[in-house]
Amino acid sequence: MMALTKIEIAENLIEKFGLEKRVANEFVELFFEEIRSSLENGEEVKLSGFGNFSLREKKARPGRNPKTGENVAVSARRVVVFKAGQKLRERVEQASSQS
C-alpha cells in the first residue's frame, strides 16, 4: 500500500495548474496549517464531500505497560477524530470493488 505525501500533492498542483513549485508547496502547507490551527482552537473542520475532523475528549484511565506489565495511569487528553463523508466512502467502496 502506498502513501500520498504533501510533496506529491504539490507536484500534482504543479502538473494540473502550472503553479510554480514554491507556490504549490506554500499552498499545501497553508492548507494543512489551517486545519491544524482550527483544531488547536477547538473548532471542527468540515470538508464537504470529503469528511470532518473533530476533537474528542478522552478521560483519564488506568492502563498497563505492555513490556513490563506494570500498571500506569493514562492521563486525560484530546484526540483528533476523522469521519469520512458519504461521497468519500462511496468512492473508496467503488474503487475497492473494481480491483
Curated annotation (Swiss-Prot):
Pfam families: Bac_DNA_binding (PF00216)
Record InterPro entries: Hist_DNA-bd, Histone-like_DNA-bd_CS, IHF-like_DNA-bd_dom_sf, IHF_alpha
SMART domains found in the cross-reference section: BHL (SM00411)
Keyword annotations of the record: DNA recombination, DNA-binding, Transcription, Transcription regulation, Translation regulation
Cross-referenced SUPFAM superfamilies: IHF-like DNA-binding proteins
Gene3D superfamilies per record: IHF-like DNA-binding proteins
Gene Ontology MF terms: DNA binding; structural constituent of chromatin
The keyword Transcription appears for this protein: yes
Single GO biological process annotation from the record: DNA recombination
Family stated for the protein in its record: Belongs to the bacterial histone-like protein family.
Quaternary structure, from the entry: Heterodimer of an alpha and a beta chain.
Task of the protein: This protein is one of the two subunits of integration host factor, a specific DNA-binding protein that functions in genetic recombination as well as in transcriptional and translational control.
Record protein name field: Integration host factor subunit alpha
Name of the coding gene: ihfA
